[in-house]
């Protein structure tokens, strides 16, 4: 199974000049956690809800997010894959790099999709028990770290 089978194809993107506050409002409204930052169809970086939370502050029951441009706070050069990348490789990279979203680029380096941890969980949930999963899955017991 390839990234093209798991990715979200209708991806909301923003320009690097978009403010972090606007990006945050878009994420809240659309119930998403990641926004690829593009210019001319080319991926420049990715901004997440975590960026808004790190740079914002809590005021009462709300989060006040600054008017800084996302180009200043985005993660530039994110890990990416192509539509033919095996899902197991996407999962492995996302786990090893502790990321929750991976942009999918075509041969022309244009954004064609986004694989998120939610997409992968939905893929896992939709997998029939009669079909093997496209990646290894096992439960490991929790071990307490040694006392220091």
Q: Where are these predicted regions, by residue range?
A:
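The conserved cystathionine-beta-synthase
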Residues: 13-31, 38-39, 80-98, 105, ...
């Amino acid at each position: 199974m390839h990234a093209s089978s798991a990715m979200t194809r209708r991806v909301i993107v923003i320009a690097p000049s978009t403010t972090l506050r606007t990006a945050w409002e878009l994420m809240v409204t659309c119930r998403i956690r990641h926004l690829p930052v593009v210019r001319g169809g080319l991926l420049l970086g990715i901004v997440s809800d975590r960026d808004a939370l790190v740079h914002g502050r809590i005021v009462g029951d709300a989060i006040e997010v600054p008017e800084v441009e996302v180009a200043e706070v985005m993660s530039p050069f994110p890990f990416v894959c192509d539509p033919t990348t095996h899902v197991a490789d996407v999962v492995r990279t996302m786990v090893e790099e502790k990321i929750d979203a991976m942009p999918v680029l075509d041969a022309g380096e244009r954004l064609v999709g986004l694989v998120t941890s939610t997409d992968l969980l939905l893929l896992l949930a939709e997998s029939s028990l009669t079909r093997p999963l496209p990646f290894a899955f096992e439960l490991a017991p929790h071990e307490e770290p040694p006392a220091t």
